[in-house]
Structure formats: structure tokens, C-alpha cells
């Protein structure tokens, strides 16, 4: 584990695999200064404040040369569903939050092996 306050060391090492910023990035304001340290950014709607900021953050991150990962916290499919808009253009997707719950909402995201599919329209009520 590397604490976000100590991630400056990443700028000095060669990385044969992509290193993704997670705790070091929360919104567009936190993107600056991370390009030399990370190859990708993990966008979580819970941390960005919602879909609008997450979409803007993805656009800005791509413009800066970052690869995009879409992640999540533990939550129901209702919380995950908006992230599917980002997932379609992300290189890495980790939307497994509903799988960690004892019971998810009806008509939520559908999982088949390593694939995740959008929810039924009835999820929205």
C-alpha cells in the first residue's frame, strides 16, 4: 500500500504495468500533478459527487493522457447504474459493489462471469 501523501516516488520509477490513482484522485481539481505518478485514474461516482462531475473528470483525465477506470464502493445496483455510462468508455471496470451485498435491488445489474450488464428499466421505479 502506498499512502497518497507518499505517491511522489511513483514519478521516479519505471512502470511496466499501469498504475492507477485511487485515493489520490477524487474530482477534476485533484487531477493536476498526478500525470507523472499514475497512468490511469479510478473514477468512483461516490467520491466525485455524482455523474456530472464524473463525466467531466473522465473527459479531463483523457485529455491529460490518463486511462480511465470506473470503480465503486459497496452499494446497490441503483447506485451503480449511472456508472455504466462511464464504463462503456473505460479500459478498466470494477462495478462489483452489489455482489458484496447480502441482497441487491430487484432488476439490478446483471453479472455473467467477468461481464456486467446494465439494469432493467424497472430498476428506476
Regions found by a protein language model. Give the residues of each.
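Short, small-residue-biased leader/transition segments that mark boundaries at the very start
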Residues: 1-2
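Flexible C-terminal active-site loop/helix
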Residues: 73-125
Amino acid at each position: 500500500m502506498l499512502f497518497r501523501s507518499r505517491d511522489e516516488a511513483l514519478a521516479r520509477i519505471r512502470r511496466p504495468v499501469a498504475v492507477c490513482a485511487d485515493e489520490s484522485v477524487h474530482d477534476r481539481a485533484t487531477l493536476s500533478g498526478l500525470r507523472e505518478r499514475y497512468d490511469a485514474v479510478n473514477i468512483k461516482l461516490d467520491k466525485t459527487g455524482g455523474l456530472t462531475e464524473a463525466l467531466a473528470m473522465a473527459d479531463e483525465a483523457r485529455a491529460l493522457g490518463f486511462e480511465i477506470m470506473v470503480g465503486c464502493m459497496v452499494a446497490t445496483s441503483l447506485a451503480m447504474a449511472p456508472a455504466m455510462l462511464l464504463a462503456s468508455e473505460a479500459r478498466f471496470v470494477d462495478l462489483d459493489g452489489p455482489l458484496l451485498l447480502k441482497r441487491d435491488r430487484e432488476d439490478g445489474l446483471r453479472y455473467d462471469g467477468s461481464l456486467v450488464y446494465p439494469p432493467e428499466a424497472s430498476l428506476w421505479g
